[in-house]
From Swiss-Prot:
The keyword Hydrolase applies. Residues 266-277 have a biased composition (Basic and acidic residues). Residues 258-277, 295-322, 420-497 are annotated as: Disordered. GO terms for biological process: nuclear capsid assembly; proteolysis; viral release from host cell. Its EC number is 3.4.21.97. This is Capsid scaffolding protein. Belongs to the herpesviridae capsid scaffolding protein family. One of its GO terms (molecular function) is serine-type endopeptidase activity. Pfam families: Peptidase_S21. InterPro entries: Herpes_virus_sf (IPR035443), Peptidase_S21 (IPR001847). Residues 601-621 are annotated as: Interaction with major capsid protein. Residues 487-497 have a biased composition (Low complexity). The record marks A254, S255, A596, S597 as: Cleavage. It comes from Bovine herpesvirus 1.1 (strain Cooper) (BoHV-1).
Length: 621
């Protein structure tokens, strides 16, 4: 065992004796895929089936540690299998100090209402399953022309997130229960794994792997610190579970709620462990999908009986929580947010209604009837002579989105012209802060030249004239450096594309034209309209008649939602092995555990008028 950092032996740092509850919680078994074949791993993380076939069986037993720290070895790998989907392992963990460390920092409310009925082993399984849900295989880095052999695999590490696809593990009290949630594991590999695991466990006997609590605490804290910047950690864990084909797992919750979720009744127990599957849907709609191959999965247990009706005093939140605790029927599901589901239903119904009932034919009046039925001019109407919407001379206003597209196109043309001519080219006056001042502002007032008493100036001063360039340096700060040319053309182009899509959607859903106007504003029948009365006769010869100008009403603001830009995933870097720097062989391995790091510092960018224009326009939409 490695020496302690302060020079004393590690044996002296081990606590006297672990607690009785910690001994009762051991051993536990862990299993999962160390790598999946052809699932998208890149670079040195790629592990082919040919390499695995050459590396099995390993030349030496593979230890299991925490986050690649050799000083925190907590178990060993019992069996490895080359499955059709990937490399699968089954291991044993027997470290009472790990159970004491996790139980000592867990809050009593973590286990919820089921805390009195949980055994010490189940408590440890909940803690370790949610703190270290992933696995990382450390392999030796091969030379360009080197072939894999039995020394390829170095060790297996329990971690928060693995860099390889589908590397989620399950912890349980027996090897059989540990392997059961993996639905993609072939029966041949399952039988071989269980047989080899039982034989290896019998050979090990009651061996334990004691670790100093200080080393455990330091490693567990470093795991939390190095992964605190991981974005959407539990979403990634859920995706990795689906990639590995895990279904019906008990202890991995992947929930944002602090305590463990509780059901309406006590969970059913089979063989000393909990088999009730806890699942909750928050703010979403669960939609069942057909199972591939036409076969439905059979549930492991019959559905639990419905809970008793809640008392009248129970709040709506409690009723919603009790309803969400019901077990879902077997099958594959997709969780859709309620708002998006309602929007899909409304759009589907609207499309069906428009298809079933096409817009009515346009309504046309004869020339004489149209002249008689046309109402007098009203404020806000478009068209010739202030006609009503159903009048033949009515001109429909252009959509507001088309005006925005035209403005965007003009901004793009200006940006291209600036890039083509440069800062000193023709047609470019320079940035606003470098142009001569056009007027004097009240809050920038200073004494006119020749009147301040600070010196004589022969030049004449005229109101409204800007200050010349030869003013003393204390009047104005030196001009800032010329900003770089605009780089927002791509953003403007994407905004134009999105606006064009919205225009096409609006035209498809709400067509403009006489047909639409006739449907929305039918003509008022049997309402004769008298000619407009004037208070005084118009004067002849007094000049041309003044035609009243009517300001067009603004088009209604379009309330279409713009698709949000997906956040870029957090940059994941390889985690260095935790241990003394002088330990040999650390740099020669490939550790597949993830660690989130801070993004590189971005230099401040100059203010871009095009970006400001796009931001202001999008904010008003």
């Amino acid at each position: 065992m490695a020496d302690a950092p302060d020079g004393g032996s590690a044996d002296a740092r081990v606590d006297a004796e672990p607690s009785a509850l910690a001994r009762a919680s051991m051993p536990v078994y862990v299993g999962g895929y160390l790598a999946l074949y052809g699932m998208g791993d890149e670079g040195e993380l790629v592990l082919t089936r040919e390499q695995v076939a050459r590396a099995l069986p390993p030349a030496a037993p593979l230890p299991i540690n925490i986050d690649h720290a050799s000083a925190c070895e907590v178990g060993a790998v019992l069996a490895l299998a080359d499955d059709d989907a990937g490399l699968f392992f089954v291991g044993v963990i027997n470290c009472p100090q790990l159970a004491d460390t996790l139980a000592g920092v867990a809050h009593p409310a973590f286990f919820g209402a089921d805390a009195p009925s949980l055994t010490p082993r189940e408590r440890f399984l909940y803690l370790v399953s949610n703190y270290l849900p992933s696995v990382s295989l450390s392999s030796r880095r091969l030379a360009p022309d080197e072939e894999a052999d039995g020394t390829l695999f170095a060790h297996v590490a329990l971690c928060v997130l693995g860099r390889r696809v589908g590397t989620i593990v399950t912890y349980d009290a027996t090897p059989d229960a540990c392997v059961a949630p993996f639905r993609r594991l072939s029966p041949r590999a399952r039988a071989a794994l269980l047989a080899n695991a039982e034989a290896a466990r019998a050979a090990l006997g009651d061996r334990a792997w004691p670790v100093p609590r200080e080393a455990l605490a330091q490693t567990l804290l470093s795991t939390a610190v190095n992964n605190m910047l991981v974005r959407d950690k539990w979403d990634t864990v859920s995706r990795r579970r689906r990639e590995a084909g895990i279904a019906g797992h008990t202890y991995l919750q992947a929930s944002a709620v602090f305590p463990l979720p509780t059901g309406g009744e006590g969970p059913e127990r089979t063989g000393g462990r909990e088999r009730a599957q806890k699942s909750a849907v928050a703010g979403g709609v669960c939609i069942a999908l057909p199972v591939a191959g036409g076969r439905a999965r059979q549930p492991e247990l019959p559905p639990a009986p419905p809970p008793p009706p809640p008392p009248p005093a129970m709040s709506a939140a409690h009723q919603a929580g009790a309803a969400s605790a019901h077990p879902l029927p077997a099958g594959d599901y997709v969780y859709v947010p309620t708002a998006q589901y309602n929007q899909l239903v409304v759009s589907q119904a609207r499309g069906a209604a428009m298809t079933a009932a096409p817009p009515p034919a346009p309504y046309f009046l004869p020339a004489a009837a149209a002249a008689a039925a046309a109402p007098p001019p009203m404020p806000g109407w478009y068209g010739a002579a202030g006609a009503a919407p159903w009048h033949p001379g009515y001109g429909f206003p252009p959509p507001g989105l088309e005006s925005q597209i035209m403005a965007l196109a003009g901004a793009i043309a200006d940006g291209r012209r600036v890039q083509a001519h440069g800062a000193d080219g023709s047609g470019y006056d320079g940035p606003l802060d470098r142009r001569p001042l056009a007027k004097r502002r009240r809050y920038n007032w200073d004494h006119p030249r020749g009147r301040s008493g600070g010196g004589d100036d022969d030049e004449a001063y005229y109101p409204g004239e800007g200050a010349p360039a030869e003013l003393p340096p204390h009047h104005h700060s030196p001009p800032p450096p010329h900003p770089p040319p605009s780089h927002a053309l791509s953003k403007l182009a994407s905004a134009v594309s999105s606006l064009q899509q919205e225009v096409s959607q609006l035209r498809a859903g709400y067509p403009y034209g006489p047909a639409f106007a006739a449907a929305q504003h039918p003509p008022a029948a049997h309402l004769p309209c008298l000619p407009q009365q004037y208070t005084a006769p118009p004067r002849v010869g007094a000049g041309p008649a003044q035609v009243p100008t009517l300001a067009p009403a603004q088009a209604p603001a379009q309330a279409l939602s713009v698709p949000a830009v997906a956040a870029a995933p957090a940059t994941v870097a390889a985690a260095a092995a935790v241990g003394p720097p002088e330990e040999p062989g650390v740099a020669a391995t490939v550790d597949a555990s993830a660690m989130a790091s801070l993004p590189p510092a971005q230099p401040p960018q100059a203010c871009d008028p095009a970006e400001i224009f796009v931001a202001q326009m999008m904010r008003q939409r």
